[in-house]
Amino acid sequence: RKNKKGRKLIMGKRTKQTITLGSGNLYITEFSGSIPENTEIEKDTNLAGYIQGGAELEHKPEYYTAEDDLGKAKKTIITKEEAKLKSGIMTWNGETLKKLVATGRVTEDTKKGIRTVKIGGIDNNDNKSYIIHFVHKDPVDGDVRVTVVGKNTAGFTLAFAKDKETVIDAEFEAAPSDDEGTLILLQEEIEQTA
């Protein structure tokens, strides 16, 4: 196959011609020191809820440049990295909020049919880190997975309006997930060889 300019198109999964289009699913589960296989994370019990507005991954490095007065010698090094994964969670409940707030506690009284979420009180900080795992499914061009370990650092706003759904905009700041200092784990589904 060729494009309009007569160039040969490379067919297959996740090539340089692949257009990534669409949203995906967001999974959140407690981090216990290592990131498990995708099948362990991608369970219904770990689904944060359905999302609105997709997901956004941001990587922001900081650099330091040393330069002589005459501009003849120059060296630039990376001094710091920051990574964030942002998403809007549209379907949620108290269990979702507990994963978004370090001071959140959830109790359920099944006899009364009430789930209670308590938020606040610095002494209630659970100091937990979570695996935040976004999956963009594409059966033709291949799936893309983005995984970070971190905490929601944006807090949340619950806006209850008569003509708009309530969406929690979460912003997870990534922390190193291994001994190499990995902040972002991005996996692409590619063609398999025999």
Where are these regions (language model features)?
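A glycine-rich, hydrophobic loop/mini-helix early in the fold
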Residues: T45-E81
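Oligomerization/assembly interface segments of phage tail-like spikes and tubes
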Residues: K74-L97, D163-S177
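Short acidic, glycine-rich loop/turn motifs
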Residues: E30, F134-D141, A174-P176
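Mixed-charge, glycine-accented linear interaction segment located at domain edges/termini
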Residues: G142-A194
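A generic structural signal for short beta-strands and their flanking turns/coil linkers
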Residues: G53, E81-L85, R115, K128-Y130
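Extended, positively charged loop/linker patches that create polyanion-binding surfaces
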Residues: K99-D138
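Polar/acidic, low-complexity leader/linker segments enriched in S/T/G and N/D
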Residues: G6-G49, A194
